[in-house]
């Protein structure tokens, strides 16, 4: 098998990322050399690659589904929104500009060249390249500058599968309409459809799928069921709805639950940090946006932000800032990560991200943050709570810690020996702990299993949850691998494999009809 295809969607969050991840895992299990690709992503959930670049977290997950180390090749252009109108532009893993729509147009020729070069390189190296679109190709107002949907498909002659989310309703109209509004040469690349998140008896849907095939001349390759047990790293903030749970809580090992309230910041970044907590039996994690929701939580997490000063102002306006201060004063557990850590310091000086200058923080931690370029992008390893830790840093802020004690020791080397043996390297103190609060710049910290267990025991003790017991064997990596295998099983079972292989190897069939709006 050799080829490439593009998985597009009728909307954002239709399921493009998970379908690509499932296909990647399915093909990798068969021994196919497969790689993911997303030409341009817009997301504040990102990871750091081994070579110090930054890519969307969804592409990192897809890479792991393929058995590959995440690389900037898989996501050469990343836009990180800092406001409704401006985003940080990351090219081949490095921030190069902060752009609005007009500024972005200046870069488009160079970006097309970057995208074309990376995709050509991957197609030469791998048997199959599975590309993911962005948003929806039906956003025809953006067609002239499109890098990730039909612009990519046309440039690289890629067949396209369109995914629609039936759980939101109107999926048949979405699928038909997506094709119908495209220009004729784009329509000719649409090879088929996938219906995602279906609940119930699929036979009841078949008449609609048959009619869709009559109207469009294109088949539906499969109907993927709504799998409540399936949850994977969120690509963007659409999955972080206030009052919504994270993952699916599992019954506690002991007699008590540990409840976690994760603050849903308006410009939240790396929201996936809390998913490691949700892997633990007896830990229930929920997104919150009101101060009243903090009262009953055993632990509050303040995650990262792409607009630290703006989100700090939001904490103050909503009363969450004062509620956080009161928690810490009372000795009740709070974990602040990256931007959240900076907000809880005494002072922020920001001439880089927001241009706001000097801003007072919430004063929980005795530290000052000054934003500077270039951005810190690094993988780290170290020790915390007597256990090895691994993670990564993505931030402009440089902190000066004064009175608070650090609680981590780190080294800027992802594979360094840190366990005290004769090859161990010296560690640099990192983070702050004071009262009931811990702060750190390190994302992914809670995925270090031994550290997470030891730290949760301390959190439970401080919260008075003496009946809470940490499971002795929870592995975040194993949970994620199991989720990818479950997803691959669903894709393998419910998608027409023969049709998929034909599209991959032969491209979109010739002679597909061109639809016109209003056609019936």
UniProtKB/Swiss-Prot annotation:
Lineage, uppermost ranks: Bacteria, Bacillati, Actinomycetota, Actinomycetes, Mycobacteriales
Gene: cobQ
Similarity section: Belongs to the CobB/CobQ family. CobQ subfamily.
Keyword annotations: Cobalamin biosynthesis, Glutamine amidotransferase
Active-site residues from the entry: 338 (nucleophile), 443
Protein name per its UniProtKB record: Cobyric acid synthase
Species whose genome carries this gene: Nocardia farcinica (strain IFM 10152)
Biological processes, Gene Ontology terms: cobalamin biosynthetic process
Alphabetized Gene3D superfamilies for the sequence: 3.40.50.880, P-loop containing nucleotide triphosphate hydrolases
Pathways per UniProt: Cofactor biosynthesis; adenosylcobalamin biosynthesis
Function: Catalyzes amidations at positions B, D, E, and G on adenosylcobyrinic A,C-diamide. NH(2) groups are provided by glutamine, and one molecule of ATP is hydrogenolyzed for each amidation.
């Amino acid at each position: 098998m050799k080829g490439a295809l593009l998985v597009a969607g009728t909307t954002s969050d239709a399921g493009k990322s998970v379908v690509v991840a499932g296909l990647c895992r399915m093909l990798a299990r068969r021994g196919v050399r497969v790689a993911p690709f997303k030409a341009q992503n817009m997301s504040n959930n990102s990871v750091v690659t081994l070579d110090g670049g930054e890519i969307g977290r969804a592409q990192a997950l897809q890479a792991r589904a393929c058995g590959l180390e995440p690389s900037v090749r898989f996501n050469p252009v990343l836009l990180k929104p800092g406001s409704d109108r401006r985003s940080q532009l990351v090219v081949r893993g490095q921030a190069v500009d902060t752009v609005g729509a007009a500024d972005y147009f200046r870069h488009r020729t160079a970006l097309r060249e970057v995208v074309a070069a990376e995709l050509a390189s991957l197609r030469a190296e791998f048997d199959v390249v599975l590309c993911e679109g962005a948003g929806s190709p039906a956003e025809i107002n953006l067609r002239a500058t499109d890098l990730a949907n039909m612009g990519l498909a046309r440039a690289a002659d890629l067949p396209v599968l369109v995914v629609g989310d039936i759980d939101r309703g109107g999926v048949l109209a979405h699928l038909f309409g997506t094709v119908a509004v495209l220009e004729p040469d784009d329509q000719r690349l649409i090879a088929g459809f996938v219906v995602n998140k279906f609940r119930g008896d699929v036979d009841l849907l078949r008449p609609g799928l048959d009619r869709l095939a009559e109207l469009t001349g294109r088949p539906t390759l499969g109907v993927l069921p709504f799998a409540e047990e399936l949850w994977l790293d969120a690509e963007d903030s659409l999955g972080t709805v206030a009052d919504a749970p994270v993952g699916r809580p599992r019954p506690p090992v002991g007699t008590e639950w540990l409840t976690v309230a994760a603050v849903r910041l308006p410009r939240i970044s790396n929201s996936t940090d809390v998913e490691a907590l949700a892997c633990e039996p007896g830990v229930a994690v929920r997104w919150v946006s009101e101060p009243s929701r903090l009262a009953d939580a055993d632990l509050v997490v303040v995650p990262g932000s792409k607009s630290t000063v703006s989100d700090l102002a939001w904490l103050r306006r909503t009363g969450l800032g004062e509620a956080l201060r009161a928690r810490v004063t009372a000795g009740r557990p709070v974990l602040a990560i990256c931007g959240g850590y900076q907000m809880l310091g005494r002072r922020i000086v920001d001439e880089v991200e927001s241009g706001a200058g000097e801003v007072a923080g919430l004063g929980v931690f005795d530290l000052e943050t000054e934003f500077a370029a270039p951005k810190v992008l690094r993988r780290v390893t170290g020790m915390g709570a007597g256990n090895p830790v691994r993670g990564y840093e993505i931030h402009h802020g440089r902190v000066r810690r004064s009175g608070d004690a650090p609680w981590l020791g780190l080294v800027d080397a992802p594979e360094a020996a840190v366990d005290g043996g004769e090859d161990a390297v010296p560690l640099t103190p990192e983070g702050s702990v004071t009262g009931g609060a811990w702060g750190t710049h390190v994302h992914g910290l809670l995925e270090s299993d031994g550290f997470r267990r030891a730290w949760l025991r301390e959190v439970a003790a401080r919260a008075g949850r003496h009946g809470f017991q940490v499971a002795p064997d929870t592995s975040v990596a194993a949970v994620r691998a199991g989720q990818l295998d479950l997803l691959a099983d669903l894709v393998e079972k419910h998608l027409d494999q023969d049709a998929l292989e034909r599209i991959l190897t032969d491209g979109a069939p010739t002679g597909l009809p061109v639809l016109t709006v209003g056609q019936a």
